């Protein structure tokens, strides 16, 4: 796989941390040309420093909810580096709280970044990807397979990403383009710790206990996730599962489309995120 990405133009959103940063570092090691972006300017600068100066790099700061910024960014990438070979839509956010406690504008923000951000990036770069017979990689989640209490907004956004990506793959069948839907399980990133809590669970669990519960679920490193994604993208796999937990959840959700929640509760044990007693 080491030569597949050499000199390929790779666009990565969410490159300031987590999976996005790990993808940037791994691709840089393989000689890729990088276009990195994030809303977090400080984190993005740190990623650029980690990548080093041996690769051609663009780095831009913008909000995935800004449609005009994304359209301009796609033009800038093509004019500066050339048409993109790979686009990795990684950027995302979440919140904590049940639907009844979550303001509508908070739901809209999560959808705007997680779903519409992916749609905007896909639209903006699609002509470039088609011209290169490249690959579009959209990050969904295991929460694109199952509902999960306290994550109404996040699950809705990730189901939407999955549906959009799988349908786009059907529409572009025969074009030579790869369309990948990626479903990570628990990844050791800061997305949960950065999440705003609209309301904590009624079981009295503190924010620290919730963060600890997320950490316990995070069984896969960003570096491992990046390697799995790149291996799958190189093969233009339509669905990429990351982690043993993702494989289990995918299987259980298909075998028990209605009763999976009870099965997964037994599998995972008591969980302060779900509102169970600690």
Regions found by a protein language model. Name each.
Residues 2-34:
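Canonical Rossmann dinucleotide-binding motif of NAD(H)/NADP(H)-dependent dehydrogenases/reductases
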Residues 30-46:
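Conserved glycine-rich Rossmann-like NAD(P)H-binding loop of the short-chain dehydrogenase/reductase
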Residues 41-42, 61-72, 104:
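The beta1-alpha1 cofactor-binding region of Rossmann-like NAD(H)/NADP(H)-dependent oxidoreductases
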Residues 98-99, 103-108:
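Substrate-binding pocket helix/loop in short-chain dehydrogenase/reductase
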Residues 122, 157:
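Active-site helix of classical SDR
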Residues 141:
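Residue(s) in the substrate-gating loop at a strand-loop-helix junction
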Residues 174-244:
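SDR active-site lid
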């Amino acid at each position: 796989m080491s030569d597949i990405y050499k000199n390929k133009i790779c666009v990565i959103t969410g490159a300031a941390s987590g999976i996005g940063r790990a993808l940037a570092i791994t691709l840089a090691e393989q000689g890729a040309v990088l276009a990195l972006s994030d809303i977090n300017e400080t984190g993005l600068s740190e990623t650029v420093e980690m990548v080093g100066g041996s690769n051609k790099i663009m780095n831009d700061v913008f909000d995935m909810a800004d449609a005009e910024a994304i359209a301009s960014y796609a033009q800038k990438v093509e004019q500066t580096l050339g048409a993109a070979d790979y686009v990795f839509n990684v950027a995302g956010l979440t919140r904590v709280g049940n639907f009844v406690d979550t303001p509508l504008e908070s739901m809209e923000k999560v959808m705007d970044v997680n779903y519409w951000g992916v749609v905007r990036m896909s639209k903006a770069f699609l002509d470039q990807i088609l011209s290169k017979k490249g690959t579009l990689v959209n990050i969904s989640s295991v929460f694109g397979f199952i509902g999960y209490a306290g994550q109404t907004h996040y699950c809705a956004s990730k189901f939407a990403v999955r549906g959009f990506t799988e349908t786009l793959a059907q529409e572009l069948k025969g074009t030579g383009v790869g369309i990948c839907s990626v479903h990570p399980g628990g990844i050791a990133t800061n997305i949960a710790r950065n999440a705003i809590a609209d309301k904590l669970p009624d079981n009295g669990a503190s924010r620290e206990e919730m963060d600890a519960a997320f950490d316990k679920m995070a069984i896969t490193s960003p570096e491992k996730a990046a390697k799995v994604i790149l291996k799958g993208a190189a093969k233009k796999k339509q669905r990429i599962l990351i982690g043993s937990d993702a494989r289990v959840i995918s299987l259980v959700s298909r075998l028990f489309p209605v009763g999976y929640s009870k099965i997964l509760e037994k599998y995972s044990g008591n969980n302060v995120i779900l509102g169970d007693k600690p």
